[in-house]
Amino acid sequence: FMSVKAPENDAFKKTWAAYVKKHNLSGGTDRVTNDPMEATYVGMHMWAQAVTKAGTTNVDAVRKAMAGQTFKAPSGFALKMDETNHHLWKPVMIGEIQADGQFDIVWKTDKTIRAQPWSPFIPGNEKKSKM
């Protein structure tokens, strides 16, 4: 959410606004950030951290280096790459949409939550590894 109050989010929004202006993107200052943008931003930074740690772009070495690493996301939380399944530990936020299209965050977790890789609500998943 653009409305998340965190220094990391302020920096993320400022960088995005500068990019929009520099490239004269349609919509100008009305353009907003969104979850796919943040996910890409986090993913690329975590990949770069893993490449640096591995000292190579070799896929197996980078995958191994990603396990357990953290990155401070625009949400202000330090997200973690799970060591066993590479799912991302993230916070949960519930927001109420406002007239301006932004969200008022009405509830959020105090910490990141480990992802559940196999939903118990999808038939057949009970046979998959719990990792």
Predicted segments, located by residue:
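Extracytosolic ligand-binding ectodomains
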Residues: 1-131
